[in-house]
């Protein structure tokens, strides 16, 4: 139900009511998310929010807060409502149609940086989404050049905005690519990196509501066995990689990792990295040429 009507409420009262509503909506991090929404609606910093708990929130800000709270109650990702998501030390723009960056994908960036030289190189990020992987690599390697490919126009536009805000457009080319095999440009890369859709089609309905009902299905659905994009990437990567170049992929579970480890005789497996749950989350191969 909406926040109770009447005179302007104090921040303390608003926080208490909103936390109860999000808890009833099965939002796991209700207390923290209410504070994020209050800061977003009011313009207060987190410190100011605490310092002014007994002050009323003006009517306009309270209306904004109510609208945003309803969106979160419906299951819409908090990142879409706030308009941004953290990734490594960045705060990236996100919104409907764009996969929300995950902490696990930071491991993919760490592995890429550990395998690449400090001097100039060219890489491709297929399925770039918000551009989180490419932006992180470009910031860490000032002489690198990135080719960002994405099949979702909304996500490609979001990646462009993020790179523009970070001053990285001069070292990047963004292209629309429906599949790994139809890239509309020629490239010879030192690295191909991807966090592709890898969830089996039949498992989509079992995902959390904020993922299942709001995030783009094309960024999640990996086909009947979750492996469609992996097969396409292994097939297409030799078109882009120089001999000795690296293919770097994120995967969803240990079963996929085991299937992928020796997937192609054109690549030599290098190593994998475990995530916070001790599951192999990303793996690297070297292209034989």
Give residue ranges: language-model regions.
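Non-catalytic accessory regions of SAM-dependent methyltransferases
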Residues: 1-42, 47-49, 57
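Conserved AdoMet
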Residues: 2, 36-114
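Short helix-capping segments at alpha-helix termini
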Residues: 26-27, 141-143, 164-169, 240, ...
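Residue-level signal for inorganic ion chemistry
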Residues: 37, 75, 105, 133, ...
């Amino acid at each position: 139900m909406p926040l109770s009507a009447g005179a302007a409420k104090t921040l303390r009262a608003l926080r208490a009511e909103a936390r109860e509503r999000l808890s009833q909506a099965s939002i796991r991090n209700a207390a923290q998310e209410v504070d994020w929404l209050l800061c977003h609606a009011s313009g207060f910093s987190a410190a100011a929010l605490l310092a002014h708990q007994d002050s009323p929130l003006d009517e306009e800000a309270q209306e904004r807060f109510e609208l945003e709270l309803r969106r979160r109650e419906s299951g819409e990702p908090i990142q879409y409502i706030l308009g941004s998501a953290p990734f490594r030390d960045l705060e990236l723009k996100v919104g409907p149609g764009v996969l929300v960056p995950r902490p696990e994908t930071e491991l993919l960036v760490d592995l890429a940086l550990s395998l690449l030289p400090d001097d100039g190189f060219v890489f491709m990020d297929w399925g770039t989404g918000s551009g989180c992987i490419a932006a992180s690599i470009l910031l860490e390697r000032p002489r690198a050049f990135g080719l960002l490919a994405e099949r979702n126009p909304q996500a490609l536009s979001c990646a462009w905005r993020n790179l523009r805000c970070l001053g990285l457009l001069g070292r990047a080319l963004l292209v629309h690519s429906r599949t790994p095999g139809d890239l509309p440009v020629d490239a010879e890369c030192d690295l191909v990196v991807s966090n592709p859709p890898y969830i089996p089609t039949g498992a989509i309905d079992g995902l959390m509501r904020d993922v299942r009902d709001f995030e783009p299905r094309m960024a999640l659905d990996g086909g009947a066995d979750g492996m469609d994009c992996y097969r396409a990437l292994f097939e297409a990567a030799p078109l882009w990689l120089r001999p000795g170049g690296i293919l770097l992929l994120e995967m969803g579970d240990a079963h996929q990792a085991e299937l992928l480890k020796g997937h192609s005789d054109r690549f030599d497996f290098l190593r994998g990295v475990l995530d916070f749950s001790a599951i192999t989350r990303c793996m690297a191969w070297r292209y034989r040429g």
